């Protein structure tokens, strides 16, 4: 469990896309590093928790009531969202990406508070309102093709499993059923034949895990297609390009799915994802130069 917690928290911190004010007093520092436990960075489990809290506090600076949404000021005119039609999913993205950090923190401390608000109460309230037509957080059922909403709901499925006792279990059956129906409308809907298939997989695996009837043939088909993208030595072809998403998406989401759901639901696929990750170990250092520099391929350097 400790290894799983550490994997998810590291993934969460690396995935959160928040801007940081680079004032000296606002930069996270590792205090009292322990180089016996962590020879390279000195960061222990507690340091990673502190780093997560540091990032999440930045987000909660914008949250003053349970109704406030994780929607942050834009820095540049060309940044997403580009029009008002994209704002609802941008708000959902803010919820989902910050929950990547909040979920393992809540697993460790369900009573966590930030900016005078109980973090668990905030996220549960926002999750419930995803399927509430009267709420500004409402996300309607899918009516078209694949969209960013699929990705964010898949991300929520990961977090709800990671901190199920805090985020999912306290909901009423009616609330669970309503949220599940919204998620299924996207999870069982069309996708793109790339790492996007993981988000269908996470939605369907989570709801299957909770006892809901899901399209299992579609779930298994997406798993097979994801594994078919493997090209050896740790590399996946991401329909059809090779880039750092091979390490970020496939080699992160694959093992997380295997640990959370796969070993129980589809052990043969879980085993293959883990073997593919092991293949990556010897090749990963070649993504960097001798002085630690890396190629800037799109935005993937952020990850």
Predicted regions and their residues:
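P-loop NTPase catalytic cores that bind/hydrolyze ATP
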Residues: 97
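Glycine-rich phosphate/ribose-binding loops and adjacent secondary-structure elements
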Residues: 281
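Aromatic-lined, polymer-binding surfaces characteristic
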Residues: 91-92, 100-105, 116-277, 286-303
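Helix-turn/linker elements and helix-coil junctions of extended alpha-helical scaffolds
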Residues: 106-110
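Structural motif marking the loop-to-transmembrane transition
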Residues: 2-3, 48, 241
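Intrinsically disordered or highly flexible coil/loop and linker segments, enriched in small
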Residues: 65-69, 111, 192, 290-293
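Bacterial Sec-dependent N-terminal signal peptides
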Residues: 1-25
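Low-complexity, Ser/Thr/Pro/Gly-enriched N-terminal "stalk/linker" regions
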Residues: 24-93, 121, 125-126
């Amino acid at each position: 469990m400790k290894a799983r917690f550490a994997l998810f928290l590291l993934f969460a911190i690396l995935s959160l896309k928040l801007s940081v004010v680079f004032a000296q007093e606002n930069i996270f520092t590792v205090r009292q590093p322990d180089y016996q436990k962590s020879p390279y960075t000195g960061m222990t489990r507690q340091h990673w928790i502190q780093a997560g809290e540091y990032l999440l506090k930045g987000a909660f600076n914008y949250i003053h009531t349970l109704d406030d949404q994780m929607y942050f000021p834009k820095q540049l005119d060309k940044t997403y969202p580009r029009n008002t039609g994209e704002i609802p999913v941008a708000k959902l993205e803010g919820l989902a990406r910050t929950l990547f950090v909040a979920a393992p923190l809540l697993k460790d401390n369900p009573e966590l508070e930030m900016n005078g608000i109980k973090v668990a109460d905030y996220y549960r309230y926002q999750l419930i309102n995803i399927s509430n037509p009267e709420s500004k957080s409402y996300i309607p059922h899918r009516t078209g093709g694949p969209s960013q909403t699929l990705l964010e709901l898949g991300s929520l499925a990961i977090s709800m499993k990671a901190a199920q006792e805090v985020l999912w279990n306290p909901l009423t059956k009616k609330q669970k059923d309503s949220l599940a129906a919204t998620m299924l409308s996207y999870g069982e809907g069309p996708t793109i034949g790339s790492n996007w298939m993981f988000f269908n997989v996470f939605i369907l695996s989570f709801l299957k895990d909770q006892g809901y009837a899901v399209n299992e043939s579609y779930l298994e088909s997406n798993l097979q297609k994801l594994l078919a993208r493997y090209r050896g030595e740790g590399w996946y072809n991401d329909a059809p390009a090779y880039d750092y998403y091979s390490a970020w998406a496939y080699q992160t989401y694959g093992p997380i799915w295997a640990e959370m759901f796969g070993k129980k639901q589809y052990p043969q696929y879980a085993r293959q994802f883990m073997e593919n990750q092991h293949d990556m170990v010897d090749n990963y250092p070649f993504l960097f130069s001798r002085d630690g520099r890396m190629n800037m391929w799109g935005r993937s350097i952020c990850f």
